[in-house]
């Protein structure tokens, strides 16, 4: 019988029931309540920046709208996704993949990184994420599991 090496409880979308989903605040709260691993979703911005967001649009999580794949990374990373969740999180923004990996490492969290490409961007999203991870040296990334509903993104 294989032994599962990962924690049995993983904070989905960085603990999105307790903090704005897929945010650095969510990572901190997940660690604070004792989670040892988190799951987060990664999509690409128009200019190829991998950012943490679940939906293809901003509509559900932000007080603004737009399609993630049609917006630049700098704009996405300045988008407030905290206020809509609760006023106590006002100013919490969409993090870059780099920021999330750094924070996971600091907090000692393992991560299930779900590659969530916009339609038509499957291969590109997988490659960008793969290159970003490969560029990190030893000790620069947390324990990591890659997942996706897109086979192409994982190739």
Residue ranges and their predicted role:
Residues 1-155:
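Phosphate-group recognition and catalysis centered on beta-loop-alpha active-site segments
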């Amino acid at each position: 019988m294989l032994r599962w090496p990962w924690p049995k409880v993983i904070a989905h979308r960085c603990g999105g029931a307790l903090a704005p989903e897929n945010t650095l605040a969510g990572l901190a709260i997940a660690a604070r309540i004792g989670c040892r691993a988190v799951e987060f979703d990664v999509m690409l911005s128009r200019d190829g920046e991998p950012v943490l967001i679940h939906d293809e649009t901003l509509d559900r999580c932000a007080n603004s709208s737009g399609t993630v794949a049609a917006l630049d990374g700098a704009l996405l990373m300045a988008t407030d996704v905290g206020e809509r969740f609760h006023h106590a999180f006002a100013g919490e923004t969409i993090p870059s993949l780099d920021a999330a990996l750094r924070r996971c490492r600091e907090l000692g969290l393992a991560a299930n990184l779900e590659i969530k490409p916009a339609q038509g961007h499957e291969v590109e999203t997988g490659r960008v994420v793969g290159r970003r991870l490969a560029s990190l040296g030893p000790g620069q990334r947390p324990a990591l599991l890659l997942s996706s509903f897109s086979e192409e993104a994982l190739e």
